Amino acid sequence: MLTTRLVDRFLDDSYSVETRRHVLPLTTARLTANACFRFAPPFLASISDDFGISLSRLGLALMITELAMGASPLLGSFVDRMHRRTAMTGGLLGISAAAVVAASSPNVWIFIVGILMISVAKFFFDIGLSAWVNDHVDYERRGRVIGITETSWALGLLVGVTVMGLVASQTSWRWGYAVGAGAVGLMALVIGARLDPHDVAGSVRDRNVVAAPMPRRGYLVFAAMFFLMASSQAMFVTFGSWLDDEFGYTEAGIAAVAFGLGAFELLASVTSARRTDAWGKERSAIAGAMLIIPAGVLLAVLHTQQVPGLVLLGLFLLGFEFAIVSLLPLAANLIPDAPGRGLGIVLAGGMLGRASMSVVATSTYDRFGIEIPALVGASMALGMILCLVIFSRDSRS
C-alpha cells in the first residue's frame, strides 16, 4: 500500500508496530486541526473588513485568546491523566465545533470565542499526540516521529489553508471555516475508530509523578519557545495584509501564496525529521532560528519587491518550522514521567509569545508597514538562540 511505503521511507522495523500503523492517520488528523488553527492570520484583512474593525483591533482581540491559553500547564497535567485516544478525539471534536462557532459568528467577540475554543481543543489534541509519541518511542529516536507528525503544520498551510482559502475566495471566509470543521470532524471519527481504547492512560499514573516540577533549566526552553513563537507570529498576522496592501492580492492570491509557503515549511519538516536526531535537538533548533534572522532583516529592506519579498518570507517560515520541529521533542522530555505537563509549560511560553506579538505586529504594521514586524521577528529569533545556547551549556555542566 502507498501508506505503508511512505512509512517505510522514514520508520524502519525497529519502531513499534503501533507507531508505524498510526503515525500517518494521526498526522492527517493534525493537518486538519492545524488548517483550522492557521486559517485566520492570512485572511485577517478580510475578517476585519467583514466585522468593520481595524487590523490592530482584531490583533488585540487575538491577544486575548492567547493570554487565556496561559492555563496550558494545568491542561497539560489534566491530559496526562486521560487516555490518549480520549484526549485526541475529544480535541478534534472540539476543534470542529469551535470552527462552526467561528464560521457563524455574528460579531467579532463571538468569533474570538470560536478562535479561543479552537486553541483550547487543539491543545488537548497536541498534548495527547505528544504524550502518545512519548509512550511509544524512545527519546533518542523521537525526533524522527515528531518530525513526521510536525509535517502536518506545513501541510495544514500547504493543503488545508489553501483549500479553505480557495473556498473563501469564491464565497466568504466563513465557508472556509465550515469546510475545515467538516474535515476535522471526519478525522475525529477515524482516530476514534483506529486507536486502542485501552492504550496508555495517564489516569493510572501516580499523581505525584504527573505533578512533578519543571527543572529550573527547563524555563530556558520556555523562554526559547516564547521568542520563537513571537518571531513567527510577527509574520503570520501581517503577511496577508502586506500582500493585499503592497501588491493588491485577492483572497485567491493569498491562498496561492499560502500554498507556496506551505511547501517551504514542508521542506523544513522533512529535513528536520531526517536530521534532528543526528544533529541534536538544541543545535537543530538554533540552526533554524539562524535562518530567520537574515530573512527578517532582508525582508524589511526589500519589502516593496514582490519576488524577493516572497522568497524571504518563505525562508523566514522555513527557519521557523525547522526550529519548532526540533524544539518540541526537547520540550516534551523536560519532565520525562509527565510529558504533557512539561510540554504544556513550554507551550504556555509560546502562547504568551504569540499573544504579545499579535498586538505588537498588527499595531506596528498599521503604522509603519511590514518593515517593523520583520525586524522584530528577527530580533525574537536571536533571543531564542541565546536561550538555547545557555540551556545547552547548563546541560553539559
Model regions and ranges:
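Central cavity-lining transmembrane alpha-helices of secondary-active solute carriers
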Residues: M63-G76, F259-A268
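Cytoplasmic helix-loop-helix junction between adjacent transmembrane helices
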Residues: L116-T151
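Helix-to-loop junctions at the C-terminal end of transmembrane segments
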Residues: S72-H83, A268-G280, Y365
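A late C-terminal transmembrane helix in Major Facilitator Superfamily
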Residues: D337-R367
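Helix-loop-helix hairpin linking two adjacent transmembrane segments in secondary transporters
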Residues: T149-A193
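C-terminal transmembrane helical hairpin of 12-TM major facilitator-type secondary transporters
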Residues: E282-L327
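Extracytoplasmic gate region of multi-pass secondary transporters
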Residues: P41, Y219-F259
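Conserved MFS/SLC helix-loop-helix module at the cytosolic interface between two early adjacent transmembrane helices
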Residues: A71-P106
